[in-house]
């Protein structure tokens, strides 16, 4: 938030308000911004690029913290804690999650129409698989920093399985 400790105490009445603001600023708002930028003609490859953009923003935000072992498990724990404390934030995150799955579904259909990927696949299941790649605990095992390259690599691995040969 680019504030000193004294400034934080001035602007935020308690730790809960500060926590909620940090979650919104570093996790919710960037995701909302990239999802809102998606156009109707998005393809799977375009959606991968969009989600990579979000992950790059998240990576930059996490690099500003002193703790270099922040990983997927930590981020998910933070989100679950925030959801328990702030129901409105939880509803906002749920809407974003549903929107993301819908955008993946749209991207898959658009890619099928463009002849880029196979027909006859379970679009709903594949959309969920794409949406959950970034939540993978594998990218944060061993108390090491989140491996953002692994996430992008996984997106493309799934996409390559769907491509027409």
Task: Give the predicted meaning of each segment.
Residues 75-79, 134:
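Well-ordered alpha-helical segments within folded domains of soluble proteins
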Residues 13-17, 21, 38-42, 84, ...:
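Residues in soluble alpha-helical coiled-coils and helical-bundle/repeat scaffolds
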């Amino acid at each position: 938030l680019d504030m000193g400790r004294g400034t934080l105490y001035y602007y935020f009445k308690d730790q809960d308000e500060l926590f909620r603001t940090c979650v919104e600023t570093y996790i919710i708002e960037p995701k909302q911004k990239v999802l809102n930028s998606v156009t109707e003609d998005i393809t799977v490859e375009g959606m991968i690029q969009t989600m990579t953009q979000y992950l790059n923003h998240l990576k930059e935000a996490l690099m500003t913290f002193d703790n270099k072992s922040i990983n997927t498990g930590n981020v998910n724990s933070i989100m679950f804690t925030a959801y328990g404390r702030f129901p409105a934030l939880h509803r906002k995150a749920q809407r974003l999650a549903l929107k993301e799955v819908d955008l993946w579904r749209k991207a898959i259909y658009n890619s099928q129409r463009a002849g880029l990927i196979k027909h006859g696949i379970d679009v709903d299941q594949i959309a969920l698989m794409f949406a959950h790649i970034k939540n993978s605990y594998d990218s944060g095992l061993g108390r090491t920093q989140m491996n953002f390259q692994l996430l992008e690599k996984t997106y493309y691995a799934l996409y390559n399985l769907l491509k027409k040969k």
